[in-house]
Amino acid sequence: ASKGNGRGPYVQADLAYAAERITHDYPEPTGAKKAQLSTVSDYFRNIRTHSIHPRVSVGYDFGGWRIAADYARYRKWKESNSSIKKVTEDIKDNYKETKTEHQENGTFHAVSSLGLSTIYDFQISDKIKPYIGVRVGYGHVRHQVRSVGQETITVTPKPKNGTQGGPVKSTSPIPAYHENRSSRRLGFGAMAGVGIDVAPGLTLDAGYRYHYWGRLENTRFKTHEASLGVRYRF
């Protein structure tokens, strides 16, 4: 222990590497709805991405256990998908080709997380203190998707009497689909790490935390974070 026999208020700054995971938790669509993009969570149902972000905490050290409030902001994740589908039909004296083009753009942003933690320190030496803790967090997530497209129909006459007529094309837009959601959820997590006292009142902190953000529509969102930071006790 250092200042105040290890007791007192403290501030902490961390740089965290977060692995963000979204998994869908509902039956796959079938029948007429199988090819339908119906909700934002359909689009973002299997995210595997990561971000590096800062985190700040303020807390109080009771000399064996701590409480802390923390705040973090995350990186916006973007994705674009495009698809082309062609269908050719033989209709009487013509060949009809229907080409459907789709362009989908989406963003997913774990905007912020505000949490409250209870942490227990194990003092195995004067300077090294492993710890474990639990966290309750209030998370804000925004996600949106926009889909646009067009349909091109090409009608080509079949050869008749040795002559071949030219193709006739017509293009029409597909109504745009846009959805924007903002979700706020209460989630729970756990943490573990080690603190190393490097100077009176100054501790180097290396830790891991898991946080379950809760359900977003029909998906589950969670993060795994590894962090490195410094803690200063007043």
From Swiss-Prot:
Signal peptide: 1
Localization (cell): Cell outer membrane
GO cellular component: cell outer membrane
GO MF annotations, alphabetized: porin activity
Residue segments, region Disordered: 154-179
Keywords: Cell outer membrane, Membrane, Signal, Transmembrane, Transmembrane beta strand
The UniProt record lists the keyword Cytoplasm: no
Keyword flag Amino-acid biosynthesis: no
Family: Belongs to the opacity porin family.
Known function: Implicated in a number of adherence functions. OPA proteins are implicated in pathogenesis and are subject to phase variation.
Protein's recorded name: Opacity protein opA65
Source organism (scientific name): Neisseria gonorrhoeae
Taxonomic lineage from the root: Bacteria, Pseudomonadati, Pseudomonadota, Betaproteobacteria, Neisseriales
